[in-house]
């Protein structure tokens, strides 16, 4: 079954085992060390990702997940499922507004790459080399080539990025260790802690043999990561205190909502060092989507960004606004007349085109949902908290129930709803009632449109 531990490619002849015939497309591109990082284009179009998995056998996994790290598509952790053909080839098309970082999830590792509108990214995935690099006993053995070969969109840069061996993670510790370290610290102490490695990382990038384009992108990724850490100051300090001191729910709520973390004047001035986050080139960064999400936890985030970056305009502000509108649409709340007017304020029509198309698709889904049958909406009535669940299920006594607690805003919940559809089809002749329960945190309008 999928996910089971399996061994492929066993070969008793050592010489035969070490022979590796690569396809002619598996080339290592020459790197131009002086190349600069090109400014990505903003245009709403189709990005194509295709490739081939070497040594693939049809009994292996027949599909893989493609995680899309777009500031829009990342809102609900959206994934594309890519079918793999019997010869190991695959192809996917995604609508995007600019360069977008994606990751392919495979049993033998994650493959990161860049896609872009009206461009094609082609991969040759060398399973033998990917597995060798992860094997404790074979890490120092002779290589079987590169783990991934890139062709098409920015192939040489993508190849170089895949080979980077600089650790640019600002604080590479288990989260509980970090919480123990920062619990009770001041904001300034937290900042010094999370940015401790920043100077040494910058120095290592500067002294590395990589191209100017690659170095620029690595520094952008450091800027994005650092911005996310600073944006999370209050939340991380509170979470650390709550976790380390093992507060119960009542104590947690009281501390989280009533405790004020003292943020010194000028605390966020450090963001002036990370101005690359407000450039189009930041869209190359694999942390871009998560950074925009983390910025949402920063109190008065737009005011802070305007003050520290010296402007209230630019790609970062466009994408924050884009993210908010996109999330509203994906929550089954079509754009209002006021929001439609707001589309004209974007610096590029690409954002408006993507939002308009997504809005049309949601309206179509809502209309289809209105025609659905085979379900009943039940009200709970006036029942005490203790009797609520027994009261709900008492209406279905004698039946097998599958109960799903979900919320309109919960990405994993909605992913799970889709995931069990094949199972429901398989069990449609069984006496099973599917009971979906949500609460007041789900806006009623969104809930009605979704069901």
Question: Where are these predicted regions, by residue range?
Answer:
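A non-transmembrane, solvent-exposed segment enriched in polar/low-complexity residues
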Residues: 1-212
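Short, internal strand/loop/helix patches
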Residues: 381, 448-451
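Sequence context surrounding c-type heme c attachment/ligation sites in exported
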Residues: 114-118, 390-394, 400, 418-421
């Amino acid at each position: 079954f999928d996910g089971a531990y399996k061994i492929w490619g066993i070969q008793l002849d050592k010489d035969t085992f070490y022979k590796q015939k690569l396809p002619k497309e598996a080339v290592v591109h020459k790197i131009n060390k002086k190349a600069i990082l090109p400014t990505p284009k903003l245009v709403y179009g189709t990005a194509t990702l295709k490739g081939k998995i070497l040594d693939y056998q049809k009994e292996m996994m027949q599909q893989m997940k493609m995680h899309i790290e777009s500031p829009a598509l990342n809102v609900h952790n959206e994934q594309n499922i890519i079918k793999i053909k019997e010869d190991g080839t695959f192809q996917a098309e995604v609508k995007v507004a600019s360069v977008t970082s994606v990751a392919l999830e495979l049993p033998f590792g994650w493959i990161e790459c860049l896609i872009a509108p009206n461009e094609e990214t082609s991969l040759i995935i060398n399973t033998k080399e990917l597995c060798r690099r992860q094997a404790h006993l074979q890490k120092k053995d002779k290589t079987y080539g590169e783990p991934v070969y890139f062709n098409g969109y920015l192939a040489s840069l993508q190849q170089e990025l895949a080979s980077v061996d600089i650790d640019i993670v600002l604080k590479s510790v288990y989260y509980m260790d970090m919480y123990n370290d920062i619990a009770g610290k001041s904001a300034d102490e937290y900042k010094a802690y999370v940015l401790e490695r920043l100077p040494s990382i910058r120095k290592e990038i500067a002294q590395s043999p990589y191209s100017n384009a690659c170095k620029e992108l690595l520094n952008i990724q450091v800027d994005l990561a650092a911005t996310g850490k600073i944006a999370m100051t209050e939340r991380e300090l509170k979470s650390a205190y709550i976790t380390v001191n093992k507060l119960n729910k009542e104590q947690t709520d009281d501390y989280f909502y009533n405790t004020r973390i003292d943020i010194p004047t000028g605390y966020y001035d450090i963001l002036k060092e990370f101005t690359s986050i407000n450039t189009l080139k930041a869209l190359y960064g694999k942390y871009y989507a998560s950074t925009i999400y983390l910025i949402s936890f920063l109190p008065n985030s737009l005011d802070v960004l305007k003050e520290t970056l010296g402007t209230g305009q630019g790609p970062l502000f466009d994408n924050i606004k884009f993210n908010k509108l996109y999330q509203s649409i994906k929550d089954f709340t079509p754009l209002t007349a006021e929001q439609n007017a707001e589309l004209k304020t974007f610096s590029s029509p690409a954002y408006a085109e993507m939002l308009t198309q997504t809005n049309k698709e949601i309206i179509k889904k809502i209309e289809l949902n209105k025609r659905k049958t085979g379900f009943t909406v039940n009200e709970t009535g006036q029942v005490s908290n203790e009797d609520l669940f027994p009261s709900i299920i008492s209406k279905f006594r004698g039946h097998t129930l599958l109960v799903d607690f979900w919320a309109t805003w919960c990405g994993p919940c909605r992913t799970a709803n889709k995931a069990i559809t094949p199972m429901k089809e398989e069990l449609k002749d069984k006496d099973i009632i599917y009971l979906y329960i949500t609460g007041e945190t789900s806006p009623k309008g969104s809930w009605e449109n979704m069901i």
